[in-house]
Amino acid sequence: MRGYKIFAGSASVDFAKEICQVLDVPLGKADIKKFSDGEISVQIAESVRGRDVFIVQSTGAPSNDNLMELLIMTDALKRSSASSITAVVPYYGYARQDRKAAPRVPITAKLVANLYETAGIDRVVTMDLHAGQIQGFFDIPVDNLYGSITFEHYIKSKNLKNPIIASPDIGGVARARYFAKRMGLEMVIVDKRREKANEAEVMGIIGDVEGYDVIMIDDMVDTAGTMVKAATALKNKGATSVMACATHGVLSGKAYDNLENGELDELIITNTLDSTEHKKIKVLTVAPLFAEVIRRVYHNESVNGLFE
């Protein structure tokens, strides 16, 4: 085998170190810095000739800097004769701009996919894309992992008396249904109307939640406005408790204030993005899952088998 190396972008150093610890391999050395005008400079500090290389870099805030850094690292590795380059992107930025939702707007998720390929990325490994069709924006393999396995273990450890799964909106029904099926639980739907960006008005509950411990499932939590309003609606319908599982803890704007003052009892997120500690937030690591996927990709083994 050619051997492989793992490098970290500045947004995911701790995440990459955890992956390397699981795989018992050293983290690759790269000198990443910024010039005084903000331009990013990258130098790969060890040979990668003929190696399969994995770059670990989430492209959350600051999204533009982290995305550009990933592309520049890719170019540096390509010019250093790496055999293949896999972008391990725990959080795929710009995924919410996946279609023309209004006149004269871009499809930025597709533009970003084009940039990945143009830079020289051969494969992408990510988790819980906001829209599954983004995989079709690429002409290279894309492994979209599911955070549900990690949430499943944690929820089982809670020994909830009467659990039920909820989708926080109509668009998330497929994700919630998949989770409910894995857990062997029933499902309800929170029906809401989004009036404008980062604001949501909960309209009603489809299904019975009285006396249930409700578990909302979503791909991300941003300002937490949707989650908190949904929790209020669920409790108004008689839910005993409400927790939410969201793979990506974006947690921008008034997110922490919303959580502090809202009816949501617990928010469970993963470490695809860094987050500030909060009494209502539980952070679960998905680095071991990514480590196993990296191992399987390198050895040409099935990734899908992890989720069957």
Regions found by a protein language model. Name each.
Residues 1-308:
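PRPP-associated nucleotide enzymes
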